[in-house]
């Protein structure tokens, strides 16, 4: 089985997909039909599966899949069939891949109509004007369909449209980021509950259940949590141990906002430097933010709570107007730490032997 680490780094996006199933004795027709059903959302156009005998005597299976819309997956086991795991590649030259598949097959099955790859976006100049030159839209459509990475996408644009690439690079980079977003790694808490055990007040346990551990119901809003107290008490460690979250310290950076996060953490940021504080504290949905080095965007498609952590010297409540304080208290559970309070239990030391 692939490791979770390799699975987190996997990404495939293309209209042409080449699959190789090693040591696979399955019937090509059955595999073809199963793959066709798997990729239904991307509108499959053609598939061919061929079985061949490997040098070691085992049966291998090769498949070429063509879809109308690019297959976009981040799960390396998406194409697993009956426990058989394939090697997944982008077929950059579908003509050569198909020829390779049909080299020495023992059994073959096809469905749909094969779509040969054009030899060049710009056509064959040796044919003069007899062949219509593709439009800019057609060339871009080909680039979008066949590019397999951000780097390849920008390289193809640079080759086909050098002037546009030089003068409008920021727009192409923006579209590249949309087509090939950064893969979100599987969340592993940087502060898992361990020894010494993390703990919290009973009143906060009552807040945790409906706001962190229960899913958001449509039409309902969560409640945020404000914790103020001294430094080095473990409150940040405790807050970060609860699950997948957006974490901001020193400043709020919307460019890295993760919609899959369960909650947000604002840690040690003065009240006056926290943009959209009302939206965060009020667990509001679908509000617009303005990243420092990016375009405005809508975030937080569902209500999620924010845990605000502050020290006594930067208590948010001391900086608020009466109206702001009223809103804050109505939308936030406020917890002021007691003297000597910690968010972890001290480690149990082994008994010392008497001398």
From Swiss-Prot:
<feature type="region of interest" description="Oligomerization">
    <location>
        <begin position="175"/>
        <end position="187"/>
    </location>
</feature>
<dbReference type="GO" id="GO:0005524">
    <property type="term" value="F:ATP binding"/>
</dbReference>
<keyword id="KW-0235">DNA replication</keyword>
<dbReference type="InterPro" id="IPR049912">
    <property type="entry name" value="CRESS_DNA_REP"/>
</dbReference>
<feature type="region of interest" description="Disordered">
    <location>
        <begin position="119"/>
        <end position="138"/>
    </location>
</feature>
<feature type="binding site">
    <location>
        <begin position="229"/>
        <end position="236"/>
    </location>
    <ligand>
        <name>ATP</name>
    </ligand>
</feature>
<feature type="binding site">
    <location>
        <position position="60"/>
    </location>
    <ligand>
        <name>a divalent metal cation</name>
    </ligand>
</feature>
<keyword id="KW-0238">DNA-binding</keyword>
<feature type="active site" description="For DNA cleavage activity">
    <location>
        <position position="100"/>
    </location>
</feature>
<feature type="domain" description="CRESS-DNA virus Rep endonuclease">
    <location>
        <begin position="11"/>
        <end position="114"/>
    </location>
</feature>
<feature type="short sequence motif" description="RCR-3">
    <location>
        <begin position="100"/>
        <end position="103"/>
    </location>
</feature>
<comment type="function">
    <text>Essential for the replication of viral ssDNA. The closed circular ssDNA genome is first converted to a superhelical dsDNA. Rep binds a specific region at the genome origin of replication. It introduces an endonucleolytic nick within the conserved sequence 5'-TAATATTAC-3' in the intergenic region of the genome present in all geminiviruses, thereby initiating the rolling circle replication (RCR). Following cleavage, binds covalently to the 5'-phosphate of DNA as a tyrosyl ester. The cleavage gives rise to a free 3'-OH that serves as a primer for the cellular DNA polymerase.</text>
</comment>
<keyword id="KW-0808">Transferase</keyword>
<feature type="short sequence motif" description="RCR-2">
    <location>
        <begin position="60"/>
        <end position="62"/>
    </location>
</feature>
<dbReference type="GO" id="GO:0046872">
    <property type="term" value="F:metal ion binding"/>
</dbReference>
<dbReference type="GO" id="GO:0003677">
    <property type="term" value="F:DNA binding"/>
</dbReference>
<keyword id="KW-1048">Host nucleus</keyword>
<dbReference type="InterPro" id="IPR022692">
    <property type="entry name" value="Gemini_AL1_REP_central"/>
</dbReference>
<keyword id="KW-0547">Nucleotide-binding</keyword>
<keyword id="KW-0511">Multifunctional enzyme</keyword>
<feature type="compositionally biased region" description="Basic and acidic residues">
    <location>
        <begin position="129"/>
        <end position="138"/>
    </location>
</feature>
<dbReference type="GO" id="GO:0006260">
    <property type="term" value="P:DNA replication"/>
</dbReference>
<keyword id="KW-0479">Metal-binding</keyword>
<feature type="compositionally biased region" description="Polar residues">
    <location>
        <begin position="119"/>
        <end position="128"/>
    </location>
</feature>
<dbReference type="InterPro" id="IPR027417">
    <property type="entry name" value="P-loop_NTPase"/>
</dbReference>
<dbReference type="Pfam" id="PF00799">
    <property type="entry name" value="Gemini_AL1"/>
</dbReference>
<dbReference type="GO" id="GO:0042025">
    <property type="term" value="C:host cell nucleus"/>
</dbReference>
<keyword id="KW-0378">Hydrolase</keyword>
<keyword id="KW-0678">Repressor</keyword>
<feature type="binding site">
    <location>
        <position position="52"/>
    </location>
    <ligand>
        <name>a divalent metal cation</name>
    </ligand>
</feature>
<dbReference type="GO" id="GO:0016888">
    <property type="term" value="F:endodeoxyribonuclease activity, producing 5'-phosphomonoesters"/>
</dbReference>
<keyword id="KW-0548">Nucleotidyltransferase</keyword>
<dbReference type="GO" id="GO:0016779">
    <property type="term" value="F:nucleotidyltransferase activity"/>
</dbReference>
<comment type="similarity">
    <text>Belongs to the geminiviridae Rep protein family.</text>
</comment>
<keyword id="KW-0067">ATP-binding</keyword>
<dbReference type="GO" id="GO:0004386">
    <property type="term" value="F:helicase activity"/>
</dbReference>
<dbReference type="InterPro" id="IPR001191">
    <property type="entry name" value="Gemini_AL1_REP"/>
</dbReference>
<keyword id="KW-0540">Nuclease</keyword>
<protein>
    <recommendedName>
        <fullName>Replication-associated protein</fullName>
        <ecNumber>2.7.7.-</ecNumber>
        <ecNumber>3.1.21.-</ecNumber>
    </recommendedName>
</protein>
<keyword id="KW-0347">Helicase</keyword>
<dbReference type="InterPro" id="IPR001146">
    <property type="entry name" value="Gemini_AL1_MSV"/>
</dbReference>
<comment type="subunit">
    <text>Homooligomer. Rep binds to repeated DNA motifs (iterons). Forms the O-complex, which is a Rep-DNA complex involved in the initiation of RCR. Part of the C- and V-complexes which are RepA-Rep-DNA complexes involved in the c-sense and v-sense transcription.</text>
</comment>
């Amino acid at each position: 089985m692939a490791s979770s680490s390799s699975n987190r780094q996997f990404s495939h996006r293309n209209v042409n997909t080449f699959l190789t199933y090693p040591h696979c004795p399955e019937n090509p027709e059955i595999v073809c039909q199963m793959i066709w059903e798997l990729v239904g959302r991307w509108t499959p156009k053609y598939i061919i599966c061929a079985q061949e005998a490997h040098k070691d005597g085992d049966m291998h299976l090769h498949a070429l899949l063509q879809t109308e819309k690019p297959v976009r997956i981040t799960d390396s086991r998406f194409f697993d069939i009956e426990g058989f795991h394939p090697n997944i590649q982008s077929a950059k030259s579908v003509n050569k891949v198909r020829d390779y598949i049909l080299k020495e097959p023992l059994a073959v099955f096809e469905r749909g109509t094969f779509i040969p790859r054009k030899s060049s976006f710009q056509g064959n100049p040796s044919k003069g004007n007899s062949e219509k030159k593709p439009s800019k839209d057609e060339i871009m459509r080909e680039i979008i369909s066949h590019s397999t990475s951000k780097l390849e996408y920008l390289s193809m644009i640079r080759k086909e449209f050098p002037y546009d690439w030089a003068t409008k690079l920021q727009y192409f980079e923006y579209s590249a980021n949309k087509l090939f977003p950064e893969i979100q790694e599987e969340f592993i808490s940087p502060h898992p509950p361990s020894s010494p055990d993390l703990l919290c007040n009973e009143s906060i346990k009552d807040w945790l259940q409906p706001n962190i551990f229960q899913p958001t119901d449509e039409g309902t809003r969560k409640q945020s949590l404000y914790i103020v107290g001294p430094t080095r008490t473990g409150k940040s460690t405790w807050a970060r141990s609860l699950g997948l979250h957006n974490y901001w310290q020193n400043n709020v950076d919307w460019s890295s906002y993760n919609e899959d996060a369960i909650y947000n953490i604002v840690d040690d940021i003065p009240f006056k430097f926290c943009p959209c504080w009302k939206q965060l504290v009020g667990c509001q949905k679908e509000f617009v933010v303005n990243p420092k080095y990016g375009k405005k965007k809508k975030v937080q498609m569902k209500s999620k709570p924010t845990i605000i952590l502050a020290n006594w010297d930067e208590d948010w409540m001391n900086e608020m107007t009466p109206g702001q304080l009223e809103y804050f208290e109505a939308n936030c559970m406020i917890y002021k730490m007691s003297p000597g309070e910690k968010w972890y239990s001290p480690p149990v030391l082994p008994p010392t032997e008497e001398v």
